[in-house]
């Protein structure tokens, strides 16, 4: 019997990244939402929103709420669009599926996944896992030795939340996964309130404000200094940007606006010389302009200080340090040396540099800090899944078939994919051995092997602490490594 094609769906709360394994090396990306325009009185499903000419007052209906898929009626409509000839043109009955699910997915929601996929869409087989479980297969942590690290920290920065996920030997250590209630949605809403209070009323302009946040936002490396800089005159200020809002007129093709002046301003060829981006030039007095000063970095700062808006949670650096402190002492050096960033929010400018700097104050002097950033963190789960599904053993090992489901029900999926809170996924990237508890003591022979490979730092060495930064191309999909070296010698 011929092996069916494998459809990969990274089913995020904000966007879907999907494609056929071995065919679509880059995913098709479409919004995971149904949008309704108040002016055009039309409904747009998924990528159809690209045809909307007036994004003012767009109302969204999303399948996800607080990070969980709770509206399968809406999700089914979006997936139907995804499978249609206009997008992927696939027949589910002739296809195997790999789909990502939320961290700590509730059992009743997980069962609904099984029912919809096998009973509604009738896929031949499918496998379900959290995004971080796929990352060991990708090239994010790839080294010159070609040996994947056995202990890593994955920071998944998504639409609803940010998760800090420890992974050992290809398995998520579920009892130590931590969540910060700061994601892309919160940052967009925070920016909406700042702009509406200080400048224009944009409470109903979610789509436009989200574009403003993505274009202008950055993580401050000097919070107090940047605040003082923003007080200078706008025309001579190195931080303040002029962001021209879209007018949604018939002659305008700029749907989300553009940066007219300041850092990252649109170049003249993109603005037709001095006017609107690819649109009809307007007199400056007719344009609605946002002055983006401290609004650029006030939102991303919440990742490091959630308490600024009343969240009783520690920031991202402290959460990472706490998670690593719960690991066996013999392995903490490897966790510190392999911290990876994935998810759409990982694209924020200066994130890796700020995280590295803040972690230096929390990391013991004998360990190294390694921050790994993908060039496209939003698509890393998808590209990692392509590597997994390309393996010879994938089809015979991971998916549950439709026949097996109707014979044993969702109980088989629970056993094979893992249940709520369990160390669930038997994913064994090359070089890993699964089934080892992260709390197991490490033998002397294994530690000596790790020292020899440079995967672990010895404690008690003498030497002055020094800092060294380097960036190298890592992996098939362009990971970037920034490393800070601890002790100068043993």
Curated annotation (Swiss-Prot):
What organism is the protein native to? Cryptococcus neoformans var. neoformans serotype D (strain JEC21 / ATCC MYA-565) (Filobasidiella neoformans)
Q: Quick one: where's region Disordered?
A: 260-285, 456-490
Q: What Gene3D superfamilies does UniProt report for this protein, alphabetically?
A: 3.30.420.40, Actin, Chain A, domain 2, Actin, Chain A, domain 4
The molecule here is called Actin-like protein ARP6
PANTHER family, sorted: ACTIN
What family does this belong to? Answer: Belongs to the actin family. ARP6 subfamily.
Q: What is its main location?
A: cytoplasm
- Quaternary structure, from the entry: Component of the SWR1 chromatin remodeling complex.
What's this chain's function? Component of the SWR1 complex which mediates the ATP-dependent exchange of histone H2A for the H2A variant HZT1 leading to transcriptional regulation of selected genes by chromatin remodeling. Involved in chromosome stability.
Q: What is the lineage of its organism?
A: Eukaryota, Fungi, Dikarya, Basidiomycota, Agaricomycotina
Q: What keywords sit in the KW lines?
A: Activator, Chromatin regulator, Cytoplasm, Cytoskeleton, Nucleus, Transcription, Transcription regulation
Which biological process, per GO, is one annotated for this protein? Answer: chromatin remodeling
Spell out the Pfam families in the cross-references.
Answer: Actin
Q: Annotated Gene Ontology MF terms?
A: nucleosome binding
Q: Name one GO cellular component term.
A: cytoplasm
């Amino acid at each position: 019997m011929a092996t069916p094609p494998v459809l990969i769906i990274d089913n995020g709360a904000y966007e879907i990244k999907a494609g056929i394994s071995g065919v679509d090396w880059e995913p098709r990306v479409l919004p995971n939402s149904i949008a309704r325009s108040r002016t055009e009185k039309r409904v747009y499903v998924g990528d159809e929103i690209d045809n909307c000419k007036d994004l003012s007052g767009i109302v969204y209906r999303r399948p996800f709420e607080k990070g969980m898929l709770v509206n399968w009626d809406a999700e089914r409509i979006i997936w139907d669009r995804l499978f249609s000839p206009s997008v992927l043109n696939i027949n589910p009955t002739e296809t195997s599926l790999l789909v990502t699910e939320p961290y700590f997915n509730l059992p009743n929601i997980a069962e609904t996944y099984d029912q919809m996929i096998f009973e509604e869409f009738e896929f031949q087989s499918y496998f379900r896992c959290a995004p971080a479980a796929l990352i060991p297969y990708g090239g994010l942590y790839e080294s010159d030795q070609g040996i994947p690290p056995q202990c890593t920290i994955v920071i998944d920065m998504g639409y609803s939340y940010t998760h800090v996920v420890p992974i050992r030997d290809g398995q998520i250590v579920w009892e130590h996964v931590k969540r910060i209630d700061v994601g892309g949605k919160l940052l967009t809403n925070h920016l909406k309130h700042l702009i509406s209070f200080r400048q224009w009323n944009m409470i109903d302009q979610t789509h436009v404000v989200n574009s403003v946040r993505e274009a202008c936002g950055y993580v401050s490396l000097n919070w107090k200094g940047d605040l003082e800089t923003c007080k200078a005159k706008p025309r001579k200020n190195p931080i303040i940007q002029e962001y021209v809002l879209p007018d949604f007129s018939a002659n305008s093709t700029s749907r989300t606006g553009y940066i007219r002046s300041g850092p990252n301003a649109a170049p003249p060829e993109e603005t037709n010389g001095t006017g609107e981006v690819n649109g009809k030039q307007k007199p400056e007095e007719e344009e609605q302009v946002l002055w983006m000063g401290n609004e650029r970095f006030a939102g991303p700062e919440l990742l490091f200080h959630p308490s600024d808006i009343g969240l009783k949670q520690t920031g991202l650096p402290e959460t990472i340090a706490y998670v690593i402190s719960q690991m066996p002492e013999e392995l903490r050096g490897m966790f510190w040396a392999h911290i990876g960033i994935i998810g759409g929010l990982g694209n924020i400018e200066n994130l890796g540099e700020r995280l590295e700097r803040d972690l230096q104050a929390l990391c013991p002097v004998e360990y190294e800090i390694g921050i790994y950033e993908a060039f496209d963190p939003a698509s890393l789960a998808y590209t990692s899944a392509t590597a997994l599904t390309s393996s010879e053993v994938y089809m015979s090992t991971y998916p549950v078939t439709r026949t097996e489901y109707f014979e044993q029900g969702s109980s088989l999926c629970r056993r094979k994919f893992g249940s709520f809170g369990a160390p669930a996924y038997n994913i064994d990237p090359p070089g890993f051995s699964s089934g080892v508890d992260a709390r197991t003591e490490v033998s002397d022979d294994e530690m000596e092997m790790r020292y020899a490979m440079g995967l672990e730092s010895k404690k008690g060495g003498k030497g002055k602490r020094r800092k060294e930064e380097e960036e190298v191309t890592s992996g098939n999909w362009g990971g970037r490594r920034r490393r800070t070296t601890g002790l100068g010698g043993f």
